[in-house]
Amino acid sequence: MSLEPTQTVSGTPPMLHQRTHKQVYPLRMETIPILESDSKATLQSNEPTQKDEEETEYFENKQSVSNLSPDLKFKRHKNKHIQGFPTLGERLDNLQDIKKAKRVENFNSSAPIADDNHSGDATANATANATANATANVNASAMPAPYMPYYYYYHPMNAPTPAMIPYPGSPMHSIMPNSSLQPFYSQPTAAGGPDMTTPQNISSSQQLLPAPQLFPYGSFHQQQLQQPHYIQRTRERKKSIGSQRGRRLSMLASQANGGSTIISPHKDIPEEDFYTVVGNASFGKNLQIRQLFNWCLMRSLHKLELKAKNQEEEGELEHLTKKSKLESTKAETDYVDPKRLAMVIIKEFVDDLKKDHIAIDWEDEEKYEDEDEEKILDNTENYDDTELRQLFQENDDDDDDDDEVDYSEIQRSRRKFSERRKALPKEPKKLLPNSKNVENTKNLSILTSKVNAIKNEVKEWAVTLDTSRPDLEWQELTSFSSQPLEPLSDTEEPDLAIADVETKLETKVDELRYQSHILNSHSLALNEITNSKVNKLNIETMRKISSETDDDHSQVINPQQLLKGLSLSFSKKLDL
């Protein structure tokens, strides 16, 4: 459904009257019908009685909505403003309309409305445009509805520009909700600018309103448009602070002209967390290694100083208990503790290293082994050892002789050092055995002992089996069984007789078990031999039969003859 409004223009000056059409109230449905506007005299007054009269005239002059669609019904409610602000219930209704927006077919939200600063000639143009739009709508009603995705309530738009801020003449200024159901509004023409109501400029002047807001007030919306500038600036500032972490330490440490120094972190930060506060990586890995090395040295020096201080305090207390104060002062003036001298030397070394007075290449790595050191020393062109060069310079104050360095002394000293180191006897490296290897050796010794015991037992059984004569044992058993039993003498004690009977019975049972075992083993062996022979005979007979028979004249096999042949072969084998 497309509803186009008619434009009304009066001859009043633009400064006196700001509103250009009749007051429009929000609807519960998805469309806002815009009809012919009344005179500006009725719009100027804000009394309730005049508004009631306007509503009666509006409903009398309005075309019946039932002619458009029998199911479409507009539910209108009054919006009586008190001092230009809507009530709480109206604002809740507007918010509900925004949240419960629905898809509307054939909905045209464009409604070009003319401005106040046009002359009487513009009236004729407006009426002509209205008639043309009416005829176009009649023709367009017969055409099919354009396809619009259900999730598009308004076309995509770019960021809101200052020209899209609601001007006082628009009905959405502090009255209408910023919803997706609002029509297009033309921009007010600037003084001396082109006429935006001409047919050539009407399409270009129509712009979408900004995205819907929860607050319908224009002043709050203007504040929101200005707010992201400050938010963006604070976000950029936070990003710069996070990315420049440790940059100040790196800049102080990388300053030239003798001003570079290493600043230690806070004492509450442990040594394990030094990597978290290391300098910025943009200054290179060299500076990071230098900072970590110096921080560890400074922290260890601080611990040594505290330890030495505690020892001195304990020594002073013990010394005061033994001697008087005068003697202690004399001893202090005469004697110098070597530990203090060592602490002073270490402190000076740490200070020089902290202030970068000692030239060290922190990224240098040993790329060669001891065998290739002599080859490196021969190549004097690439040799550059700053510490040794400073030690072997003849004139430290002469700047002209800095480039001319005698490498012969350096080479000679390095050769002597390498020869001396090679002459020292190298102790063999002690390697710890692997726990798995130790466990495997123990298991191997246990298993070998078990295997040897089993082998010895097998040998003993073989000897006993070779020496035994089962036939003689059977003869002895038969002779014993045939002999009559001798009566026991009364003189023998019954206990000794029972013991002898038990021992004899055990020996006989053992012999019987042994003989039964031998018979069983012989029977199993004979069975296996016969089975193997039968299988071989079957294979041979089948092979002969297959070779003798032809495809055309196949002979019938007689099973009786086969059985006879098998029986004869078995009888021959048994006779043998």
Curated annotation (Swiss-Prot):
The keyword Cell division is assigned to this record: yes
Region (Disordered): 1-22, 35-64, 185-205, 227-246, 412-437
Anything else known: Present with 1310 molecules/cell in log phase SD medium.
Described function: Acts as an essential component of the kinetochore MIND complex, which is required for the spindle checkpoint and kinetochore integrity. MIND plays a role in establishing a bipolar spindle-kinetochore interaction by joining kinetochore subunits contacting DNA to those contacting microtubules.
PANTHER family: KINETOCHORE-ASSOCIATED PROTEIN DSN1 HOMOLOG
Keywords from the named record: Cell cycle, Cell division, Centromere, Chromosome, Kinetochore, Mitosis, Nucleus, Phosphoprotein
Compositional bias annotation for Basic and acidic residues: 420-430
Subunit (UniProt): Component of the MIND kinetochore complex, which is composed of at least MTW1, NNF1, NSL1 and DSN1. Interacts with NSL1.
Superkingdom classification of source: Eukaryota
InterPro entries associated with the record: Dsn1/Mis13, EF_Hand_1_Ca_BS
Keyword GTP-binding: no
Entry GO terms, CC: kinetochore; MIS12/MIND type complex; nucleus; outer kinetochore; spindle pole
Residues the record lists as Phosphoserine modifications: 250
GO biological process, one term: attachment of spindle microtubules to kinetochore
Localization: Nucleus; Chromosome, Centromere, Kinetochore
Residue ranges with Polar residues bias: 1-11
UniProt-recorded name of the protein: Kinetochore-associated protein DSN1
Disulphide bond pairs: none
The gene coding this protein: DSN1
Comp. bias intervals (Basic residues): 235-246
